[in-house]
Amino acid sequence: MRDNTAKGITAGSGSQQTTYDPARTEATLTTTTFALRRYDLAGRALYDLDFSKLNPQTPTRDANCQITFNPFGGFGLSGSAPQQWNEVKNKVPVEVAQDPTDPYRFAVLLVPRSVVYYEQLQRGLALPNQGSSSGSGQQNTTIGAYGLKVKNAEADTAKSNEKLQGDESKSSNGSSSTSTTTQRGSTNSDTKVKALKIEVKKKSDSEDNGQLQLEKNDLANAPIKRGEESGQSVQLKADDFGTAPSSSGSGGNSNPGSPTPWRPWLATEQIHKDLPKWSASILILYDAPYARNRTAIDRVDHLDPKVMTANYPPSWRMPKWNHHGLWDWKARDVLFQTTGFDESNTSNTKQGFQKEADSDKSAPIALPFEAYFANIGNLTWFGQALLVFGGNGHVTKSAHTAPLSIWLYIYLVKAVTFRLLLANSLLSKSNIYKKTAN
């Protein structure tokens, strides 16, 4: 979790912790509660603010549009929750900033829970335990809500001649065929078994050492898609994985306790169509310790990536070179696949990435899934305004290359939102253009 300027509120502690942003280690995000922990001025922990269990109400205002508050009774509450609170409350806080002019007002950056799980999966961290390994009394931390397992490769000489081809396997090795079909929940020896087919090829620069490179079904570099079953080729889809266990069995499959489906790669258009569920959100929170009505939720704003990309300067719609002076083709492919622009569109005449070297077809640049959530942040209170910076979607392999920030959401006390576009750099004040939102 990222904590910029909040002095009285930070993340809770737990047995399992992981830092969401490695550059900021002063606060951590627990994988069990996803809660903010409130501290007093002496540094003593008071209580946790768990949004999934919180029943908030919006504060009341006086004739001057000021929040009504007294030290004993707390905030005046209207009795109604903020709009779309049921969707927002399931998101995870990843950054918090305290208003220097109001010790009770905080701005919280919320992201979908699946984004944090995806971040942990990319970093190779342990996922939340949802099961235990069979035959062992110890809990296996590598078996999480995704159903992932880690096991060292072992040679099995007894099954060196085994073939997953049903009748062919039965004729060549009857005992092996019987055991194979039994492991898959069937005792019928005539049942044919379909195996996962992965085609491989040698790298051109690694023929001597025998290293292999995936040619198809490369799930690490391409989004998971469901394809037609042809022969024995099997392709997975994103719904085969999940983010949280489902005790009612309403998840990705019909088995009890199966994980709910999630999509690790989201296009800009998908986030735009369902902002309460998939976008990053800004929550304005009022919290006053020792008061009867101590917590109130002022408002919720969603950060729309489609609006961000629509305001890109023309120069940013062209392909970019990385800091090595080389064009990152892998980054371009990831950009296409994660934004949904990998499909041909003959009517597309906008500036963007050239899809084919011998063609004039191009796709408009869009904010990738990872860049959208990774770059939005750096909450900063500036007087009565809150600045939220966002990235321009530049994809690079280097972890030290900071993308230019082009977007600021400014929150004012009178509930007026201004959006500013930085054309070149955050430090160049002469290139700021203002746009007032409706």
Curated annotation (Swiss-Prot):
UniProt feature coiled coil, ranges: none
Ranges of Low complexity composition bias in the record: 171-189
Annotated region described as Disordered, given as residue ranges: 1-22, 156-264
One Pfam family matching this protein: P1_N
Chain intervals with Basic and acidic residues compositional bias: 156-170, 191-206
Organism domain of life: Bacteria
Family label: Belongs to the adhesin P1 family.
Protein name stated in the entry: Uncharacterized protein MPN_205
